[in-house]
Amino acid sequence: MQNKIKVVFCGTPKIGADVLKALIEMNQVEIVLVISQPDKPIGRKKQIVHTPVKKLALENNLKVVQPNKIGEIYDDLAKLEFDFLITCAFGQFIPTKILKLAKIDSINFHGSLLPKLRGGAPIQYAIKNGDKKTGITIMQMVKQMDAGDYYVQESIDILDSDDSGSLFEKMGHLAYSMCKKYLVDIYNHKFELIKQNEDEVTFCKNISSEEEKINWNNTSLDIFNLIRSLSPSPISYTTINNQRYKIKSSKVIDLDNQNKNAIPGTILGINKQGIVVKTLDKALLILEIQKEGKKMILASNYYLNKLSDLKINDKFD
């Protein structure tokens, strides 16, 4: 290939940086511009931290811009010549007039097996739904969210041991390898686009703060999946006596007969493994817990260190 593939890349978190890393490593690619969300204050000290995409771009001497809305830089983009606009977890709506600036196509690395899980939180929802598989779809971007035809998709297994953190990591590796494997073939028009089956479309909006609260009237499996989907951030929570407790990890366990009629949310046991709580159908063993204002600890500390703020027969709201 004589001419380099010219790319404008849009992305923000680590999974976006994984795709950018692949592009940087490809000799066939020239990255014309990197676009990322504005830097935000992080943590208790509210320090301004570069997005992972911006950090990687600066380390590789790439030009980076961070508009509040990408439409603000339309005139600048229109002056550039580029073959692809490539996005992965950018986090902004991109107007159609910008999508049309790419000579060949505007494509997105979407974190699900489309048409399932269109929307902003596909990786979290795959876990929340209890799915056993998910994957990456390289798709055309169109005005309607995640509705474009796609070039290719690859799947990976979701293990019971996965949470959002580990699944994001695995999906990042998959997106990285797919970028290297397929971009040149897409450039050379070696793919036939595949239409999404509209009868199989599902959606996933961003998980709201209200949905982060555990409902103990749900099944153990549903609560287990919710906890995994929100770990390591923002972390699901429960309350008792107006006190909030975050729960980072858990395990589904069976009930003994004497506790089958207990009210969901009741603490049934505190032992060397953790804290046992009644759910709709079984019990949940809490493995990691954080009282508001304190550090995250192993729930077994309640037994080993005789912590007294949670007791057997207490009931979470």
UniProtKB/Swiss-Prot annotation:
(6S)-5,6,7,8-tetrahydrofolate binds at S112, L113, L114, P115. GO terms for cellular component: cytosol. Keywords: Protein biosynthesis, Transferase. CDD domains: FMT_core_Met-tRNA-FMT_N, Met_tRNA_FMT_C. One of its GO terms (molecular function) is methionyl-tRNA formyltransferase activity. PROSITE patterns: GART. Its EC number is 2.1.2.9. It catalyses: L-methionyl-tRNA(fMet) + (6R)-10-formyltetrahydrofolate = N-formyl-L-methionyl-tRNA(fMet) + (6S)-5,6,7,8-tetrahydrofolate + H(+). The keyword Membrane does not apply. Belongs to the Fmt family. HAMAP family: Formyl_trans (MF_00182). Attaches a formyl group to the free amino group of methionyl-tRNA(fMet). The formyl group appears to play a dual role in the initiator identity of N-formylmethionyl-tRNA by promoting its recognition by IF2 and preventing the misappropriation of this tRNA by the elongation apparatus. This is Methionyl-tRNA formyltransferase. It comes from Mycoplasma mycoides subsp. mycoides SC (strain CCUG 32753 / NCTC 10114 / PG1). The gene is fmt.
